[in-house]
Amino acid sequence: MEVTVNRRKWGIISLTGTVGFFFAIAPVLDPYIVIEIGSGFTLKINDVIMLFLTMLCFSKSYRFERKTGFLCIWLLGLGLIGIFGNLASNTDMANSFKNLIVWLIYAVCLTYLWKTPCRDKFLQWIEIIAIIASILVILQFVSGYVGIGMWDGRIPGLALGKYDGWAGYIDVNTGDIRPNGIFQEASYLGIYVSVAYVQAFKEEKIKRMLLYAISMLMTTSVVAIIILVTTTVLILIMKLSL
């Protein structure tokens, strides 16, 4: 009897950990695709993983959250406004319907996945990925200035969409060193690492804070620097007010 209970608990923890890992790794995998047909249909790696995990979670609990339905109604309303706007501007109606359907599916799947108890695992994976990305940023920064070849962060063997590009850690237009870690652009890294930075700040992990702050500054991304300064000031104000 104990073995059965342990197996069930292990299964729940495993699924929870997988969902948390998916939410953490999704921003890294976002630009990569499985298949692209013309300019109207693109199936991303994240889409496949999201649908698969949603089916696994749904097989354990069939309950449909009220807030999910509320979100869908809002998205449907915004989508209809967009469609009416297309009617006025004579733009592609089929593409608008496709986008509306896709975002409704995303709303259902992501809110359903997020209700699983995956927050702790999500934050753990965020920290691990942020540390790896930050270390890579420092290596890219040093390599760029020394003139040594370095991995640009793009995952080998995975394809990008037709209209997507990979910025790399050297700006092709200006030649500036703008480390991007394992993200498509330097600003995306700044946004992602800021989550780990806030978490480290709250837990007073000084070494991690410094690592994240250095990597965000090295990107020279305006977005990353603004987020770094803003979050630091806000957290200090909150701590002083307590």
Q: What are the language-model segments listed below?
A:
Residues 1-62, 80-86:
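N-terminal signal-anchor transmembrane segment
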Residues 21-31, 75-86, 132-139, 213-220:
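Aromatic-anchored segments of alpha-helical transmembrane domains
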Residues 9-21, 62-76, 119-126, 207-208:
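Membrane-interfacial loop-to-transmembrane alpha-helix junctions, especially the N-terminal start
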Residues 145-166:
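Juxtamembrane non-transmembrane "cap" segments at the membrane-aqueous interface
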Residues 73-77, 90-114, 125:
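Aromatic-anchored transmembrane helix interface
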Residues 124-148, 167-220, 225-238:
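Alpha-helical transmembrane segments of multi-pass inner-membrane proteins
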Residues 54-65, 110-119, 199-206, 233-241:
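Structural signal for the C-terminal ends of transmembrane alpha-helices
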Residues 29, 40-59, 97-108, 187-197, ...:
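Membrane-embedded alpha-helical segments of multi-pass membrane proteins
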